[in-house]
């Protein structure tokens, strides 16, 4: 909408703003669980993957879409977040804040989600955390994991790749957003933990 305004295309700008308002209202109502934003998906619904299967379907790895994204053994869609707390769940709002584009999500929900990222994704010492992927943080080092599944939430059997990892780009974005939202001590603690990993 901002770009359309800059180009003088008022009709397109109005259309884009209307689409945005509908999407914003839907996301705030349907994707916020009272504490953070989630991926709304039925992990057990094979038809969600089947919708992308086509005749002669082959992926780069040589398998078919259904083979790649459905586990017969567990009867579940692979590589999802579901009810987890994702480190980048409000990244769009961080970008909008930095660029002065305004509110993407409800401000109170954004602050709650940012606090949830600190509460659930920040691990002061990674030594007790199982990580089957790349090790960017270990033993007594701390950081924000890409996704966390707090007690009482369903963790997919085969979650989104790299969920248990820390990645400093994501971490710095989340930490700086915490600070921007007034969660200064939390954001600074995350930044200090990241910096200690590289000292």
Where are these regions (language model features)?
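Well-ordered alpha-helical scaffold segments within catalytic/enzyme domains
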Residues: 1-10, 88, 92-105, 172-184
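Extended amphipathic alpha-helical segments enriched in small hydrophobics
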Residues: 1-4, 20, 24, 163-198
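Amphipathic, non-membrane alpha-helical segments in soluble helical-bundle scaffolds
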Residues: 13, 17, 83-86, 164, ...
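Short, solvent-exposed positions on alpha-helices
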Residues: 11-14, 108, 185-189
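Active-site neighborhood of glycoside hydrolase catalytic domains
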Residues: 1-36, 105
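Extended glycan-interaction surfaces of carbohydrate-active proteins
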Residues: 29-168, 189-198
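Serine/threonine-rich low-complexity intrinsically disordered regions
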Residues: 12-15, 45, 65, 183
